[in-house]
Amino acid sequence: MSTSEFQQFFDDCVGNWSTERTYHYLTQQEVERSHTKFVVEPITESLKLKVLADNAFSVPPHVNSLPGYHLKFETVSEKGEKVSQQLNMLFVTQEQESNFLQGKYLRDRAYEEERPIIADFRFDNTKRELLMTTNYTRVIAVDSITMINPSLRIRRILTYRRPTEGEALSDVVLVGFGVEQKGI
């Protein structure tokens, strides 16, 4: 697959978005709804280099063409709790197959932990789905974004208790679903 479809996915992600999500906290048997407004903007080459440096990741020769974005969001839960965050992210493709790209997803700030982090990604062009897997200290988050059209995305989040090294993911602690609409 060519990287142009991958780039188009990210071009479609740029803009102002609004999302309604439902989170199922399985360990507490609680369900929570939230509303998030977020903005996705491309980042400069200097910010791409900063994300690489923050993660002690080697600079690839084609850094200027890597998909890199600034994400800014504010979430309000149905309980009135507010969370705001900003971060920069970069996607470095390492393998290409006929309908898939995969590689590393770097952030200068993780969602679950206050530190830079390197995760894995896999992009399926036939489904227009970006699957990101992040290994945190206590959990592993598997986050899916499926682009239905340039103004509608479906989000699915599965968070697992981190298993012992070599064991499969099995103990789900959080399930999240979201509908994300651009320009609302």
Task: Identify the meaning behind each predicted range.
Residues 3-4:
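Short, Gly/Pro- and small/polar-rich lid/capping loops
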